[in-house]
Amino acid sequence: MDLLVAEVVQLFYTLLWPMIRISAFLLTAPFFSIQAVTVRIRVLLALLLTWMVYPLAEWPVIDPLTALGLQEIFMQIFIGVLLGTLLQVVSAALIVGGQAISASMGLSMANMVDPNMGNVPVIAQFLIICSTLIFLALGGHIIVISLLLESFQLMPIGEMFEAQPLMALIIQWSSMMFLGAVLLAMPIMVSLLLINIGLGVITRAAPALNIFAVGFPAMILAGIILLSMSMSSIGFRIQWLWQESFKIMNQALGVA
C-alpha cells in the first residue's frame, strides 16, 4: 500500500511540471485564451497535452513544497507565459492598426465590448476575426502546440537557463506591435488623408458647403471601400505576422 502511494505521489510530481508550463501557455496564447474556449476545455486540453508529452522525456522528481520546487513553479509559469506573450504581440498589432484605421475613418468612438480585449474599435475587431481565421488556416494551432511540446526538449524541466537573452529577444519582438500596425493601417490612412485634404480644398472653394454633413459620411464610405479593396494585401500581411511569430517562438527556444 505504501509502495502504491509512493508511486502515485511520484507520478504527480512528474506530471505537475509540464502541466504548469502548458497551462500558463494556454492562459496567455491567442485563440486558446479567448472566452469561447472555456476553462473546462483548457483544463482538458492541458491534461491531454501533458499526457502526450509525458513519455517523451525523463522527468525529474521535485517536491513543489521545497524551495527548489517553488523556484521551478515560477520558472515553468515564466516559460509558458513567455511563449504565449510572443504570440499576443500579433493580436496587439491588429488592435493598434484597427484603432488607427478607425480614427482615420471617424469611427474612433464606435467600439465593441470584447470579453477578451475590452473596448475594441469595430475595425480592430474585424481584423482580429480575420487573423483568427488565417491563424487556423495556416495550421497555427498545430504549429504552436508542436513548438510547446518541443520546448520540453530545448528547455528541460529542472535545468536553469540565462534569462537575459530571452528578455532582449522579447523587447526586440515587441517593436513588431507597432511595425505590424503600420503595415496594416498605413495604406488606408494615407488614402483617407488625401481624401480629407480634398474635402478641405472643396470646403475652401465653397464655404457654404456643410463639411460636417458631407465629410463624415464620405470618410466612412471611403474607408469601407478602401478596406474592402485592401483585404487581399491585409490578409497577406496578417499571414506574414503569424509566420514571424512562429519563427520568433522557435528562436526563443533556441536562445534558451
At which residue positions do the language-model features occur?
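Hydrophobic alpha-helical segments and their helix-loop boundaries in membrane
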Residues: 1-256
